[in-house]
């Protein structure tokens, strides 16, 4: 038998006060704790390791629910133990009062006539008997193997005997504890559910604002400088999301100002060079015929072309260009333009299609792609038209990796073996004109099926995807291939196939 006791000094004459000098109360055997005296908490692990992507609202809800559950469990244990200890203290006080009354009756009448009181009970716990032998009145709580709690109270008599009183923890007290536990469980569940709902509500609001901020930032990145992230997220409450939005807006404004300043400087320099270069070319044409004159004319023409290209890039960067739309038959248009430009280039019209586009800008894109293939690739150069898709392929070393990863960039040729063979403006202009047309310009390298990336490319393909509908604005730049999307049409399937084969080559 195990338990705990509370001792009291015995009284000699009736009515003598007694003191309570025993050890402090024990929490009792009814405390429901796990191993080591702590409740066991099971966690969920491996979400990041498994690559599971969850929304902010669910993370916040789970965190609030977990904290609420832990707090509810801790408070429930504290309340349960406090209630049990309080009820045991009341039961011990009652047993102590009853044994004191039984002692007085026995000493007054000389016989034991109090219910449930016994003299020299052989079942008296040894721990309680030792306290009684010390001349003190005491109470003791023990627990049977079957979980039933017993309450003992004993007092030494003047004649040397020991009077004890034994009672069980009443069913009524057990029912009260059971009802209390049930109320605590219901309250804990309500706290967890309420916390989860609150987490979903708060997290959903925050997640929505973050999604709107991300969408607005993507619009700014795609070429819409007038979009403001702070205006996009809205809301009356000011929090960290507003700080992020203001920081993104400030960064976008600073970048836009720098880009605009760079564009203006480039345009001003090119414009200032245009007049003297034209004069130089005119003067070179007046020189007497001969090899030196041809060299001067060739370099003067190259300089004029460079100046014109720089001016065109500056205009395209200003996002002020507008397409002059016409309805054309794409296959026939490409065939006639390529034949006039370079009859040696093979043109195949797989599927004819009528498109609404700007013929001048489309011709500019097509000629720049052909010039790039002729300059940096190897023959034969092939052009194919399939619906709204134009492909230009050569059999050279392929595009450089940085071009495939980042897109065309001015004054970057992308390969050391082509030093001095270009300024990196051809594909930059082609990409800018494609943007004005609302088209998409993509690049990829051709390798044998299943060949690793280090195997040299067997050719390069530039693909122009004309839009199904006529462009209504020029605020977005052409995108590189999106490997996560594929369509049902043959052109969409081809785009997915091209994007999966990797990218590499020239500017």
Curated annotation (Swiss-Prot):
Record localization: Cell membrane
Reactions listed under catalytic activity: ATP + protein L-histidine = ADP + protein N-phospho-L-histidine
Cellular component GO terms, alphabetical: plasma membrane
Region (Disordered): 1-42, 472-507
Superkingdom, taxonomy of origin: Bacteria
Keywords linked to the UniProt accession: ATP-binding, Cell membrane, Kinase, Membrane, Nucleotide-binding, Phosphoprotein, Transferase, Transmembrane, Transmembrane helix, Two-component regulatory system
Gly residues bias (residue ranges): 25-37
Single GO term (MF): ATP binding
Domain Histidine kinase: 268-470
UniProt xrefs under Gene3D superfamilies: 1.10.287.130, 6.10.340.10, Histidine kinase-like ATPase, C-terminal domain (3.30.565.10)
Modified-residue entries (Phosphohistidine), positions: 271
Pfam families found in the cross-reference section: HAMP (PF00672), HATPase_c (PF02518), HisKA (PF00512)
Role of this protein: Member of the two-component regulatory system CseB/CseC involved in the stability of the cell envelope, through activation of transcription of RNA polymerase sigma-E factor. CseC functions as a membrane-associated protein kinase that phosphorylates CseB in response to changes in the cell envelope.
Protein name as it appears in the record: Sensor protein CseC
Taxonomic source organism: Streptomyces coelicolor (strain ATCC BAA-471 / A3(2) / M145)
């Amino acid at each position: 038998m195990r338990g705990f006791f509370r001792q009291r000094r015995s009284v000699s004459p009736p009515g003598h006060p007694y003191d309570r000098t025993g050890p402090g109360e024990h929490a009792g055997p009814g405390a429901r704790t796990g191993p080591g005296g702590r409740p066991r908490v099971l966690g969920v692990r491996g979400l990041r390791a498994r690559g599971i992507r969850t929304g902010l609202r669910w993370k916040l809800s789970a965190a609030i629910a977990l904290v609420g559950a832990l707090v509810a469990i801790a408070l429930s244990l504290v309340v349960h133990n406090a209630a049990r200890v309080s009820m045991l203290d009341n039961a011990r006080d009652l047993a102590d009062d009853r044994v004191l009354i039984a002692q007085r009756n026995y000493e007054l009448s000389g016989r034991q006539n109090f219910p449930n009181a016994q003299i020299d009970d052989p079942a008296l716990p040894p721990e309680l008997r030792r306290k009684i032998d010390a001349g003190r009145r005491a109470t003791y709580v023990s627990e049977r193997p079957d979980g039933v709690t017993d309450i003992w109270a004993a007092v030494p008599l003047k004649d040397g005997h020991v009077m004890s009183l034994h009672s069980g923890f009443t069913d009524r007290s057990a029912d009260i504890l059971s009802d209390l536990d049930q109320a605590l469980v219901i309250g804990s569940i309500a706290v967890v559910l309420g916390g989860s709902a609150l987490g979903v509500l708060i997290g959903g609001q925050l997640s929505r604002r973050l999604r709107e901020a991300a969408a607005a930032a993507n619009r700014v990145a795609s070429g819409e400088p007038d979009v403001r992230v702070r205006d996009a997220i809205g809301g009356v409450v000011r929090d960290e999301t507003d700080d992020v939005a203001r920081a993104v807006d400030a960064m976008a404004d600073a970048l836009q100002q720098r880009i605009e300043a760079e564009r203006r400087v480039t345009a001003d320099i090119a414009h200032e060079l245009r007049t003297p270069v034209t004069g130089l070319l005119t003067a070179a044409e007046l020189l007497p015929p001969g090899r030196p004159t041809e060299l001067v004319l060739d370099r003067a023409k190259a300089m004029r072309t460079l100046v014109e290209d720089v001016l065109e890039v500056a205009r395209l960067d200003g996002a002020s260009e507008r397409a002059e739309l016409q309805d054309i038959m794409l296959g026939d248009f490409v065939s006639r333009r390529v034949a006039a430009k370079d009859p040696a280039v093979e043109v195949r019209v797989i599927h004819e299609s009528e498109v609404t586009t700007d013929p001048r800008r489309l011709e500019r894109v097509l000629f720049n792609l052909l010039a790039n293939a002729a300059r940096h690739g190897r023959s034969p150069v092939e052009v194919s038209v399939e619906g709204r898709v134009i492909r230009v392929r050569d059999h050279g070393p392929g595009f450089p990796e940085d071009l495939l990863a980042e897109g065309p960039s001015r004054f970057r040729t992308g390969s050391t073996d082509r030093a001095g063979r270009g300024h990196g403006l051809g594909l930059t202009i082609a990409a800018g004109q494609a943007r004005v047309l609302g088209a998409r310009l993509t690049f990829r390298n051709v390798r044998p099926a299943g060949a690793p990336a280090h195997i040299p490319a067997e050719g390069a393909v530039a693909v122009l995807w004309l839009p199904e509908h006529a462009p209504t604005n020029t605020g977005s730049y052409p995108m590189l291939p999106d490997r996560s999307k594929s369509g049902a049409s043959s052109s969409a399937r081809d785009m997915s196939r091209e994007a999966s084969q990797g990218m590499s080559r020239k500017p």
